[in-house]
């Protein structure tokens, strides 16, 4: 009996801490949007993600419904599957950004090499 009460209180504590953390993360995203440190689309994505976290923490039974719609056994399974898809998307985005940066660096290095080839070297 006491263990059951403690488990319920612990779950509530975990939910409270999680919501506080998610709201803190949301405030950081909004601050970065105001400073224009991130693009509008990136900000919108992270607002969606952290909002989704808040919904999950406040209404954990919501994922039971999502699991039924997706045809998955449990809500936690649906959460894991959705998380994996989101992580693969983020990995793809990082790959695309790194690939773009590599192309830009290659272009800059080639421009510098061509410029240095035809300009006389200055001696100190």
From Swiss-Prot:
It is a multi-pass membrane protein. It is found in: Cell membrane. The chain crosses the membrane at residues 13-33, 43-63, 71-91. The keyword Cytoplasm does not apply. GO terms for cellular component: plasma membrane. The keyword Transmembrane helix applies. Keywords: Cell membrane, Membrane, Transmembrane, Transmembrane helix. It holds the Pfam family DUF2304. Its main location: membrane. To M.thermoautotrophicum MTH137. This is Uncharacterized protein MJ1580.
């Amino acid at each position: 009996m006491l263990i059951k009460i403690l488990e319920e209180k612990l779950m509530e504590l975990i939910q409270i801490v999680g919501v506080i953390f998610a709201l803190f993360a949301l405030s950081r995203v909004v601050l970065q949007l105001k400073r224009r440190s991130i693009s509008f689309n990136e900000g919108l994505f992270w607002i969606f993600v952290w909002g989704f976290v808040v919904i999950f923490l406040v209404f954990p039974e919501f994922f039971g419904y999502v699991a039924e719609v997706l045809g998955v056994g449990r809500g936690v399974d649906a959460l894991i599957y959705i998380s994996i898809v989101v992580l693969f998307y983020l990995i793809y985005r990082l790959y695309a950004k790194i690939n773009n940066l590599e192309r830009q660096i290659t272009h800059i290095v080639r421009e510098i090499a061509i410029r240095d080839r035809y300009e006389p070297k200055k001696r100190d």
